[in-house]
């Protein structure tokens, strides 16, 4: 019998938790870490790797992906859609800067109700989406100086163009790792570099992550990477192939023991199928209703705290 592809994830989680290197990390929580983990997921049958050993809020993941592709870096559009995955970083910054003991719900209400407050405290800096669709572009201005252009490089649009015009290229890449702009980011990109490969009319992709939180981040990361392949394939008139995932520092947080134990006690269920309801004009015109998930029957959700 063929092993369920989700077992790769469960095995990595077990290896990290029971035998990983115990590390004191930036957050102060501590992790148990592996280095250099690879997983492969077949997308050619229409399924997507949406983790089943706990419920994943896949609509929130789609909303985040659409937000990335919009180039926005402020949490307000996410919070207005009841997506809270990025709130903790600006909330932590606000608390430290003001000393105000505000809870997350109150902070999010102010983000939604007060656009000026959101502009000041809800922005994450030049994170993922900014780099994906508006990577800074500079042109010579004379005397050895350079001028930053108003409109940057849209890596996603250029990628689609290359997939259509030169699908055998080895430069089918986009990245969020912009070294000079890292200090201004609330969190440097974890899922940082994506590369694509076309063979036999099928589009495959590799996602490289410098850092991966197996408990909370990984399920969103692989699902969104798989959805991206489906979107890119649709835009370039290709079929989906395979998702290869590569994690450098692949870890479980020390306060996620209950999550690990519970997930490892559960058996994976069949991955669901993803269909796209329409073909939008471009990568930036997709909406939540365009994504149809069928056959998702996960185990119950497991709550765990995010490390900031």
Curated annotation (Swiss-Prot):
<keyword id="KW-0963">Cytoplasm</keyword>
<dbReference type="InterPro" id="IPR023451">
    <property type="entry name" value="Thymidate_synth/dCMP_Mease_dom"/>
</dbReference>
<dbReference type="GO" id="GO:0006235">
    <property type="term" value="P:dTTP biosynthetic process"/>
</dbReference>
<protein>
    <recommendedName>
        <fullName>Thymidylate synthase</fullName>
        <ecNumber>2.1.1.45</ecNumber>
    </recommendedName>
</protein>
<feature type="active site" description="Nucleophile">
    <location>
        <position position="190"/>
    </location>
</feature>
<keyword id="KW-0808">Transferase</keyword>
<dbReference type="GO" id="GO:0006231">
    <property type="term" value="P:dTMP biosynthetic process"/>
</dbReference>
<dbReference type="InterPro" id="IPR000398">
    <property type="entry name" value="Thymidylate_synthase"/>
</dbReference>
<dbReference type="InterPro" id="IPR020940">
    <property type="entry name" value="Thymidylate_synthase_AS"/>
</dbReference>
<feature type="binding site" description="in other chain">
    <location>
        <position position="221"/>
    </location>
    <ligand>
        <name>dUMP</name>
    </ligand>
</feature>
<feature type="binding site">
    <location>
        <position position="307"/>
    </location>
    <ligand>
        <name>(6R)-5,10-methylene-5,6,7,8-tetrahydrofolate</name>
    </ligand>
</feature>
<keyword id="KW-0489">Methyltransferase</keyword>
<feature type="binding site">
    <location>
        <begin position="170"/>
        <end position="171"/>
    </location>
    <ligand>
        <name>dUMP</name>
    </ligand>
</feature>
<comment type="function">
    <text>Catalyzes the reductive methylation of 2'-deoxyuridine-5'-monophosphate (dUMP) to 2'-deoxythymidine-5'-monophosphate (dTMP) while utilizing 5,10-methylenetetrahydrofolate (mTHF) as the methyl donor and reductant in the reaction, yielding dihydrofolate (DHF) as a by-product. This enzymatic reaction provides an intracellular de novo source of dTMP, an essential precursor for DNA biosynthesis.</text>
</comment>
<feature type="binding site" description="in other chain">
    <location>
        <begin position="251"/>
        <end position="253"/>
    </location>
    <ligand>
        <name>dUMP</name>
    </ligand>
</feature>
<comment type="similarity">
    <text>Belongs to the thymidylate synthase family. Bacterial-type ThyA subfamily.</text>
</comment>
<dbReference type="GO" id="GO:0032259">
    <property type="term" value="P:methylation"/>
</dbReference>
<dbReference type="InterPro" id="IPR045097">
    <property type="entry name" value="Thymidate_synth/dCMP_Mease"/>
</dbReference>
<comment type="subunit">
    <text>Homodimer.</text>
</comment>
<keyword id="KW-0545">Nucleotide biosynthesis</keyword>
<dbReference type="Pfam" id="PF00303">
    <property type="entry name" value="Thymidylat_synt"/>
</dbReference>
<dbReference type="GO" id="GO:0004799">
    <property type="term" value="F:thymidylate synthase activity"/>
</dbReference>
<feature type="binding site">
    <location>
        <position position="213"/>
    </location>
    <ligand>
        <name>(6R)-5,10-methylene-5,6,7,8-tetrahydrofolate</name>
    </ligand>
</feature>
<dbReference type="InterPro" id="IPR036926">
    <property type="entry name" value="Thymidate_synth/dCMP_Mease_sf"/>
</dbReference>
<comment type="pathway">
    <text>Pyrimidine metabolism; dTTP biosynthesis.</text>
</comment>
<feature type="binding site" description="in other chain">
    <location>
        <position position="26"/>
    </location>
    <ligand>
        <name>dUMP</name>
    </ligand>
</feature>
<dbReference type="GO" id="GO:0005829">
    <property type="term" value="C:cytosol"/>
</dbReference>
<feature type="binding site" description="in other chain">
    <location>
        <begin position="210"/>
        <end position="213"/>
    </location>
    <ligand>
        <name>dUMP</name>
    </ligand>
</feature>
């Amino acid at each position: 019998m063929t092993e369920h592809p989700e077992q790769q994830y469960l095995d990595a989680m077990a290896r990290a938790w029971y035998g990983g290197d115990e590390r004191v990390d930036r957050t102060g929580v501590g992790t148990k870490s592996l280095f250099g983990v690879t997983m492969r997921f077949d997308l050619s049958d229409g399924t997507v790797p949406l983790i089943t050993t706990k419920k994943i809020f896949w609509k929130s993941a789609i909303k985040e992906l659409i937000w990335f592709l919009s180039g926005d870096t402020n949490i307000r559009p996410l919070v207005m859609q009841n997506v809270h995955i990025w709130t903790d970083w600006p909330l932590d910054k606000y608390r430290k800067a003001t000393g105000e003991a505000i809870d997350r719900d109150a902070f999010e209400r102010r983000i939604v109700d007060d656009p000026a407050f959101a502009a000041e405290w809800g922005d994450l800096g030049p994170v993922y989406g900014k780099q994906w669709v508006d990577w800074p572009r500079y042109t010579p201005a004379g005397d050895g100086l350079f001028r930053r252009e108003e409109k940057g490089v849209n890596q996603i649009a250029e990628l689609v163009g290359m997939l259509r015009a030169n699908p055998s290229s080895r430069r089918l890449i986009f990245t969020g790792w912009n070294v000079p702009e890292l200090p201004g980011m609330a969190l440097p990109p974890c899922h940082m570099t994506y590369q694509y490969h076309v063979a036999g009319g099928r589009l495959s992709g590799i996602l490289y992550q410098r850092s991966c939180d197996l408990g909370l981040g990984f399920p969103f990361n692989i699902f969104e990477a798989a959805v991206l392949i489906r979107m890119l394939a649709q835009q370039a008139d290709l079929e989906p192939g395979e998702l290869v995932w590569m994690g450098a520092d692949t870890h479980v947080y020390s306060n996620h023991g209950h999550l690990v134990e519970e997930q490892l006690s559960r058996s994976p269920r069949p991955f669901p199928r993803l269909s796209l309801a329409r073909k939008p004009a471009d990568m930036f015109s997709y909406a939540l209703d365009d994504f149809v998930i069928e056959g998702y029957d996960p185990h119950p959700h497991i709550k765990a705290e995010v490390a900031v």
